[in-house]
Amino acid sequence: MKCGQWSRLREPFLLGPPKGDGPVVVRASFQVRDINDLDDEAETFEFGGVLKLTWHDERQAFDPAEAGVAEKIYQGAYQFNELSPAWYPQVVLVNESGLFEKHGVILRVQPDGTLTLVETVNAAAFAFF
């Protein structure tokens, strides 16, 4: 095993949730931007809005002077999915009725390890009118 491979094995596993005394506390908010296509017969509606999740992961903390930035920002699907080395909460719409799209993703990482994920959501959901 090469030295570089060994050092990677000793680094903390960043794609799993942070280890701690309990569950990861995630603050969530959702701002509804529009409601479309109310269907009384199917008992569904479509909506769009902005989802914001904030949590703390000390493994993501960094020194701004060393990193050369006051905050790390990953924006767009490529940077978020391929470049950001972070675990993030998975969101599920339990009353989804076929449409659940997320776009415009941005992940902000503060020096203390506070992460904020913001993305737009377009979805259809069952609503029992």
Predicted regions and their residues:
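Soluble non-transmembrane domains of integral membrane proteins
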Residues: M1-F129
